[in-house]
Structures are given as structure tokens and as C-alpha cells.
């Protein structure tokens, strides 16, 4: 298979690494900046903005790729799948219309409401900021304020957590566009990702991501500082009943999309809040999570190229998808000052990483030296029979890096896990 990977982050390095495990797979990559990890795996790369559909389509035709795997959300929103499909390239990724499950928060909520799909929190959509502000002023209780469009995982403000009522009103003024106001959900977050071929849905191991920048879940929201999976592919605060409910919601969404005339193909990412009433949908993403892709793709023991064929041809089957029964812990290194004022162009050096897997993200290689850029730098994944061992592998590797970077030492630790379990019991 000759396959094009679109995107140049840690998630895309994990996708390329998983594809490279298949003998005879030729990888080509289109990305805005040269990712050193992807560049080593690719036969040829094209440096281009990931929303430049002309350049990407021309590169696909020049190289003769038969398939494409789309990593980030921006090219999906721009319609890269529609463009590549028209050029005869089979894509693991949704069309522009289907990607609205992520790129348009109102579309997602309204679809769930129309098809009476479980797990939809109470919500209101406003296109006039004045009406949204009036609703917030009169509403008794806390709300989540979400811009309708893409925000890179950093655009939500939650009353009672990040902002008060006045702060929420100020944020709506700042957005000055469409917003979704939702009931504030209380519980523990978890991620369920699935391969989807338009009809069939094959779930992956559950993952928990950590959005806050600093230890103890403090500080500003980020794109994700790290994540973990358990050896049984569950999470300690998610029951089998909860998992069944979450998967049922995703199956219903895929069926609703097909019924609407937007069949969904690619990766569907469900971010859920496990509440006292069961799982509620925080949001859907139209692609792998970053960092969650690094956990599940490290565990994938079946052939990703075959899975891509199943997605594109509508022949996806759970019998062809298997994951190793092991724990994983992913820890991101980020520049000092991240996310608000990251130190850029700062050299870093990687020490002894042991058995950890390294995934390069927003990092530049200059004359053999790695330098930080403005976002998350690189990630280490530890894989082991137990969570404690996986955490130690990731932590040792992350601690080996010298330079103006930091990471969250608490991700994957028993202490943090115990807090999650205790929090769930309190509900």
C-alpha cells in the first residue's frame, strides 16, 4: 500500500509508525513543518500548510498514493477528504460534511437531539451574543460555554471552574459569534475511540487524557499533557455498563450520520463525562486524539494498513482488529511557559530513554539538534504489563530530557488514579 499521512504532530508520528510496521507499506507525508520522526519513516515528504488542498492533491497524484490517513481536524474541516476522494485516493477520514460532528458543536448537539440519542446534556445554541449573555445572566446554575467552531481543545470555559458568571459573559463577548451553552457536567472524563467504515464500528481501548498544564490537574487547559490505558482496556472508574452505554451512543451517532446522508468513515473520538447518571457526551472529534492515538496505536497488534482498507471499503470487522493486553502511559514534554507563552527555539537533549517509545511533535531538528517550537514538543510512551511499570518507563524517559521543557510527573501514577476513583465514588 502507498499511503499518504496528512499532518505533522505526535499523533501523526504514531500513525506513521503503526503503518510502518506493515511490510510493503510506503509512507508519504504532507505536513506544515518537518517532523523528524515522520520524515525518517516516509519515502517522500511535502512541506505545505495542511489546509492547502491543491498542494496535497498534487502531491498525492505525483506520488501515486492509493490511500490517505488524515491526522488533524483543520484539513478535515477544509475538505481534504472530498478533494482526495475526487482524485481517486481512498481516505481514512470523514468528508467535510461528516467532519461537522467535530467542527460544528451545534450540528453535533442538534443531531443527537433530533435522533433522541442518549448522553446529550441540556444545551442551547445562540448566534446572537446579546441573547447568549441574557441567557447566562438569567440562568440558575453553572454552564459550559463553547464556541461553535474549532478551538484546538482549548476553547471551552466552564463556570464555577475557570470563570464566574461575569467571566462567562466576557468570554461570550470575546467570541462574538455562535456559542453553545450547556449544563455543566460533573464526573470523570474518559475517551472512547473507534474505527468506523460508514456502518460498522470497532472500539479501541479506553483512554484518559489530562488537559490541565500542571500537576494535580491545575493550570490552564492544553491540547493534552499525557494519557494512560489499563491492561484490561477499561478504566478503574468506568464499569462495563458505562462502556456499553458510551459505545451505544457512538453506534447511534454513526447510524444517524448515515441516515442524514453523511456516512462517517475514519476515526470517531468520543469524549465522555462519566456522571452519576452514566456517560454524557462532552464532544466528538473526527480524528484520533493527541495524545490518545499514541496509547492505542502503541497497543495495536493488528495491521493498520488492513484496517485502513476496511474503513475505506466498508469491510471493517472486529475480528481483524486486536490490541495487546498491556498498560500504556504517555507523557508530553512541553516548552517552559506553555501554553500561554512558550519558549521557542530552545535546544533540548534526549538522554537514556530505555524501552520508552518516542513520538516527535512540535519540534525542529537543526544541524542534529532538537529545538522547541510553540506547542507540545515530544512524547514518550511506556508500555508494560502493569500501569506502575508503564508509568516508570515513561517517567524515566521524560526525566532524561534536558532543556527548557517540563512534563507532568503525576500522569499514570497510583496517587492520581486513586483521586479519580474517589471522585467517582463521591458522585
Swiss-Prot record:
PROSITE patterns on file = ATP_GRASP, GARS
Main EC class of this protein?
A: ligase
Which residues of the sequence carry a binding annotation for Mn(2+) 1? 271, 283
Binding of ATP, residues: 136-191
Q: Name the positions where Mg(2+) 1 binds.
A: 271, 283
Can the keyword Ligase be found in this entry's annotation?
yes
GO BP annotations, alphabetical order: 'de novo' IMP biosynthetic process; purine nucleobase biosynthetic process
Pathway of action: Purine metabolism; IMP biosynthesis via de novo pathway; N(1)-(5-phospho-D-ribosyl)glycinamide from 5-phospho-alpha-D-ribose 1-diphosphate: step 2/2
What note does UniProt attach to the cofactor annotation? Binds 2 magnesium or manganese ions per subunit.
- UniProt-recorded Gene Ontology molecular function terms: ATP binding; metal ion binding; phosphoribosylamine-glycine ligase activity
Q: Which Gene3D superfamilies match?
A: 3.40.50.20, ATP-grasp fold, A domain, ATP-grasp fold, B domain, Phosphoribosylglycinamide synthetase, C-terminal domain
Entry binding sites for Mg(2+) 2: 283, 285
Instruction: Identify the EC number(s).
Output: 6.3.4.13
Q: Which domain of life is it from?
A: Archaea
- Which PANTHER family does this UniProt record tie to the protein? PHOSPHORIBOSYLAMINE--GLYCINE LIGASE, PHOSPHORIBOSYLAMINE--GLYCINE LIGASE, CHLOROPLASTIC
| Family from the record | Belongs to the GARS family.
Alphabetized HAMAP family for the sequence: GARS
Q: What is this protein called?
A: Phosphoribosylamine--glycine ligase
Amino acid at each position: 500500500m502507498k499511503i499518504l499521512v496528512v499532518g505533522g504532530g505526535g499523533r501523526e508520528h504514531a500513525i506513521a509508525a503503526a503503518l510502518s510496521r506493515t511490510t510493503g507499506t510506503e509512507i508519504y507525508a504532507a505536513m506544515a513543518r518537518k517532523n523528524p520522526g515522520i520524515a525518517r519513516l516516509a519515502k517522500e515528504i511535502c512541506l505545505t500548510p495542511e489546509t492547502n488542498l491543491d498542494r496535497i492533491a498534487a502531491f498525492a497524484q505525483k506520488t501515486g498514493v492509493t490511500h490517505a490517513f488524515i491526522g488533524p481536524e483543520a484539513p478535515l474541516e477544509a475538505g481534504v477528504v472530498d478533494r482526495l476522494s475526487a482524485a481517486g485516493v481512498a481516505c481514512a477520514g470523514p468528508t467535510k460534511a461528516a467532519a461537522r460532528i467535530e467542527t460544528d458543536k451545534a450540528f453535533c448537539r442538534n443531531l443527537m437531539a433530533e435522533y433522541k440519542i442518549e448522553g446529550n446534556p441540556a444545551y442551547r445554541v445562540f448566534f446572537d451574543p446579546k441573547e447568549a449573555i441574557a441567557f447566562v445572566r438569567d440562568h440558575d446554575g453553572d454552564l459550559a460555554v463553547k464556541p461553535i467552531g474549532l478551538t484546538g481543545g482549548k476553547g471551552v470555559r466552564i463556570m464555577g471552574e475557570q470563570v464566574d458568571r461575569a467571566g462567562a459573559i466576557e468570554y461570550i463577548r470575546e467570541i462574538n459569534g455562535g456559542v453553545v451553552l450547556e449544563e455543566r457536567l460533573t464526573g470523570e472524563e474518559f475517551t472512547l475511540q473507534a474505527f468506523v467504515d460508514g456502518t460498522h464500528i470497532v472500539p479501541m481501548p479506553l483512554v484518559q487524557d489530562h488537559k490541565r498544564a500542571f500537576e494535580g490537574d491545575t493550570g490552564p487547559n492544553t491540547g493534552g499533557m499525557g494519557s494512560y490505558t489499563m491492561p484490561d482496556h477499561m478504566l478503574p472508574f468506568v464499569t462495563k455498563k458505562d462502556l456499553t452505554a458510551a459505545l451505544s451512543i457512538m453506534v447511534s451517532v454513526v447510524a444517524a450520520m448515515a441516515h442524514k446522508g453523511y456516512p462517517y468513515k475514519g476515526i470517531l473520538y468520543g469524549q465522555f463525562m462519566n456522571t452519576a447518571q452514566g456517560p454524557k457526551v462532552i464532544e466528538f472529534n473526527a480524528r484520533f486524539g493527541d495524545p490518545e492515538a499514541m496509547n492505542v496505536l502503541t497497543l495495536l497488534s493488528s495491521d493498520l494498513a488492513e484496517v485502513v482498507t476496511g474503513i475505506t471499503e466498508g469491510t471493517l470487522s472486529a475480528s481483524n482488529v486486536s490490541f495487546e493486553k498491556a498498560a500504556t502511559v504517555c507523557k508530553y514534554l512541553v516548552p517552559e511557559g506553555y501554553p500561554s507563552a512558550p519558549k521557542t527555539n530552545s535546544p533540548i537533549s534526549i538522554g537514556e530513554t530505555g524501552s520508552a517509545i518516542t513520538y516527535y511533535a512540535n519540534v525542529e531538528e537543526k544541524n542534529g539538534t532538537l529545538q522547541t517550537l510553540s506547542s507540545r514538543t515530544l512524547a514518550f510512551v511506556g508500555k508494560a504489563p502493569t500501569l506502575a511499570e508503564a508509568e516508570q518507563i515513561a517517567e524515566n524517559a521524560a526525566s532524561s530530557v534536558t532543556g527548557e521543557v517540563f512534563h507532568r510527573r503525576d500522569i499514570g501514577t497510583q496517587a492520581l488514579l486513586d483521586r479519580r476513583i474517589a471522585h467517582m465514588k463521591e458522585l
